[in-house]
Amino acid sequence: MIRQRLDEALVARQLYPSRARARDAILRGTILVDSEPARKPSQMVLQDAVLTTADEAQKYVSRSALKLIHALGHFNINPESRTCLDIGASTGGFTQVLLQRGAEHVFAIDVGHGQMMLEGPRITLHEGLNARDLKLEHISEDVSLILCDVSFIPLHIALPSALDLVKSGTDLIALIKPQFEVGRQGVTRGGMVKDETAHARVCAEVAAFLVGNNWSVYGTIPSPMDGGDGNIEFLIAAKKN
């Protein structure tokens, strides 16, 4: 009987939209093969194998939703009735969580186009907008919660405009991606940052950047899952003084 890689089988059966999402689910231990936990994405499975998933990420347009849910719980930040700014909104994983948790409105911005998978009267989408070019005319003075998940740009470049525009008491949750913070010299050929010392240094530098911009840092925690490329990520939360 024909065998197939597990990650390919999950996509072929339309349980996941891509091998990357399937691989992530397997590595997080959410996939069963004939009632047994899956071992690895390359595991070979029979065509008639029973594949089941108990993956919370499937409820959302992006797995990043689980990262925000973890941070909201850990830092005890409630989006209910708040106006939020989602920087690097992409498909809308963070925005979806905010709306489900009662956010009054979400201003979603992304430098790309055509990625957002959500729509509705509580979302204002600004596509093709670089976070560095953010102005008050793009959002509202009522924003009291900033979320940030950006790639290919360090936070000290992506965040200043947003940090300056909002009022005292505004909360921030940002995803720290070391591979975009350390510079080329700190990244391996495969784009990985595995050095724990580098992780600690990056988190400390982001925290110092926020403090230097008149924000008080609640803390920094590991993300509950790695990035799509396998890099370890962190979540930082802060409040504007």
Question: What are the residue ranges of the model-derived segments?
Answer:
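A basic, amphipathic helix-loop patch mediating RNA/tRNA/ribosome contacts
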Residues: 1-47
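C-terminal substrate-binding/active-site "lid" region of AdoMet-derived donor-dependent transferases
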Residues: 34, 161, 179-221
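S-adenosyl-L-methionine
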Residues: 104-157
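Core SAM-dependent methyltransferase catalytic element
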Residues: 225-241
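Conserved SAM-binding loop of SAM-dependent methyltransferases across substrates and taxa
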Residues: 91-102
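Conserved class I S-adenosyl-L-methionine
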Residues: 80-90
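Conserved beta-strand signature within the Rossmann-like core of class I S-adenosyl-L-methionine
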Residues: 169-183
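A short glycine-rich, Lys/Arg-flanked "PGG" loop and its adjoining helix->strand segment in the class I
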Residues: 156-173
